[in-house]
Amino acid sequence: MALSDLVLLRWLRDSRHSRKLILFIVFLALLLDNMLLTVVVPIIPSYLYSIKHEKNTTEIQTARPALTASTSESFHSIFSYYNNSTVFTGNATGGLPGGESPKATTTQHTVTNTTVPPDCPSEDKDLLNENVQVGLLFASKATVQLLTNPFIGLLTNRIGYPIPMFAGFCIMFISTVMFAFSSSYAFLLIARSLQGIGSSCSSVAGMGMLASVYTDDEERGNAMGIALGGLAMGVLVGPPFGSVLYEFVGKTAPFLVLAALVLLDGAIQLFVLQPSRVQPESQKGTPLTTLLKDPYILIAAGSICFANMGIAMLEPALPIWMMETMCSRKWQLGVAFLPASISYLIGTNIFGILAHKMGRWLCALLGMIVVGISILCIPFAKNIYGLIAPNFGVGFAIGMVDSSMMPIMGYLVDLRHVSVYGSVYAIADVAFCMGYAIGPSAGGAIAKAIGFPWLMTIIGIIDIVFAPLCFFLRSPPAKEEKMAILMDHNCPIKTKMYTQNNVQPYPVGDDEESESD
């Protein structure tokens, strides 16, 4: 037994420097972060709606206590806004003592409720107002993450990737527990905003860590495709996982399960990454302002932003639109996103490998066009089955864009700047967050003002119009001084021009040459 323990400890010690184990840690962190991101999608609209109408019901009962005894048996049916169901209580007049007839106000209230289909909320104005409220709640996470990313990028350049990665775990655990026990809009908003800080740490540090250990362009693309598969699985599992547990167990259950999984991720990070050790970069990275002036980095970031903005606009608006037009039950609000999540997982895994062969710029261009066309088709759905094909197209196409653009960001830094990746993946995450910040907040307001179909039309056209810009990523030029370094046979980085047919193999030297001024 002691010998087997020693063997296990030796294997774990040797595995600390394994690239595959680091890839697994990043995969798991992105998986859990995006499960928490999307598990709230089917829960929040219905939960906020139930909170509001339970409060209204309590106020009505408090204002008219004298009517309680005389009208408790006069209802033929009672409609519950909490679970969208109608409870039948018996004959409307047979149970009245002394044959008394109900008051006019009570009779009017009963007629109003019984005319509503059992699965459709009747307060259309409340649902329209909820578009804005839910949109702002969803956007708060991305907005905070957007503001935090530049600082995390600079921090990783100074102290390395393990400490920010572990800090992301700690913050995400606190946020998950807050979600579980929050019972008001204000606390939900705080929990969602706090998640943005944790996500910034995990995303920037995780992608930067992968770029630093996978220096070959093809290997880096494959690794990031796998890591984005974790993101895809989180998006895939989150909505149905949340909606099913919410309907059959309660709001707290999905968040407590997630909190337990986050603890497991933290334990693995603590042992493998040793986050107490400061590991600064060996060379000074390119300033963030310089990277932001690079037009090729901006095009890649724009592709990530606008592609993800489509699904970000869907998250708060689609469940509310389904409640209005399809009379959907709570579990259907999350399951509707299942085709997009499955296809995103397929897209990231296929094009993580295929994009390197056919050209990442081409994959991104085609992906942007498919995203736009699929989004334009969503308002034509008449039931949940009509959402399957367009949602599948949206998810698959976003998988094409993300799995192509994430490696290109690292490639552009290798080609045109200093190969330090914290800042460039902060920019990539900023682009992702801008989509998820602008999307829900603007989407909720637009859906309220001009309707859900016009919202889909606007973002669909934007994606299609932006697509041709990806052509400029076909063969981005290298800076002159950087090209001289890349052509050096001692350069540890293997690069590939996407217009070439063959990859020039560069032998890896034992020692890295320091950057010359």
From Swiss-Prot:
It comes from the Eukaryota. The chain crosses the membrane at residues 21-41, 133-153, 163-183, 193-213, 223-245, 252-274, 295-314, 332-355, 361-381, 393-413, 418-438, 444-465. This is Synaptic vesicular amine transporter. Disruption phenotype: Mice are born at the expected Mendelian rate. The homozygous mutants show severe growth retardation and the majority die shortly after birth. Serotonin binds at residues 231, 235, 308, 311, 315, 337, 344, 402, 436. It is found in: Cytoplasmic vesicle, Secretory vesicle, Synaptic vesicle membrane; Cytoplasmic vesicle, Secretory vesicle membrane; Cell projection, Axon; Cell projection, Dendrite. Residues 1-20, 154-162, 214-222, 275-294, 356-360, 414-417, 466-517 are cytoplasmic. It comes from Mus musculus. The modification Phosphoserine is found at residues 514, 516. The keyword Membrane applies. Keywords: Cell projection, Cytoplasmic vesicle, Disulfide bond, Glycoprotein, Membrane, Neurotransmitter transport, Phosphoprotein, Synapse, Transmembrane, Transmembrane helix, Transport. The keyword Heme does not apply. Residues 42-132, 184-192, 246-251, 315-331, 382-392, 439-443 are extracellular. GO terms for cellular component: axon; centrosome; dendrite; dopaminergic synapse; secretory granule membrane; synaptic vesicle membrane. It holds the Pfam family MFS_1. Strongly inhibited by reserpine and tetrabenazine. Also inhibited to a lesser extent by ketanserin and fenfluramine. Reserpine and ketanserin inhibit by blocking the substrate-binding pocket. Tetrabenazine traps SLC18A2/VMAT2 in an occluded conformation and its inhibition is specific to SLC18A2/VMAT2 but not SLC18A1/VMAT1. Glycans are attached at residues 56, 83-84, 91, 113. Disulfide bonds join 120-327. Signal peptide: none annotated. Interacts with SLC6A3. Expressed in striata and substantia nigra. Residues 105-115 have a biased composition (Low complexity). Residues 100-119 are annotated as: Disordered. InterPro entries: MFS, MFS_dom, MFS_trans_sf, MFS_Vesicular_Transporter, Multidrug-R.
